[in-house]
Amino acid sequence: MSILSSLISISNPMKSSKSSVANGGGSSLSMGSNSIACGSCGSNGGNGRKRLPSDYTNIDSNAGSYTTASGSTYSYSYSYGYYSGSCGCN
């Protein structure tokens, strides 16, 4: 059962809440030498649009099944990736 629990725990990493690097609902926020101006999370997202699947990098996925010693078979699938930008809203 621990395998199933760990698979369930990694099955939803791409589900994230709305987020934005914003200050005052639309003003820019400096982030060191690589400063990026980010707006608030509006209808178009913090970086001017909503995140697209192409915004994510290092996406990996896998699916399969396994059988326990008692003969029960379980199926699993997962996918994950990293958002490479500094602004955006889901």
UniProtKB/Swiss-Prot annotation:
One of its GO terms (biological process) is sorocarp development. InterPro entries: HssA/B-like_chaperone, HssA/B-related. Coiled coil: none annotated. It holds the Pfam family Coiled. Belongs to the hssA/B family. This is HssA/B-like protein 4. The gene is hssl4.
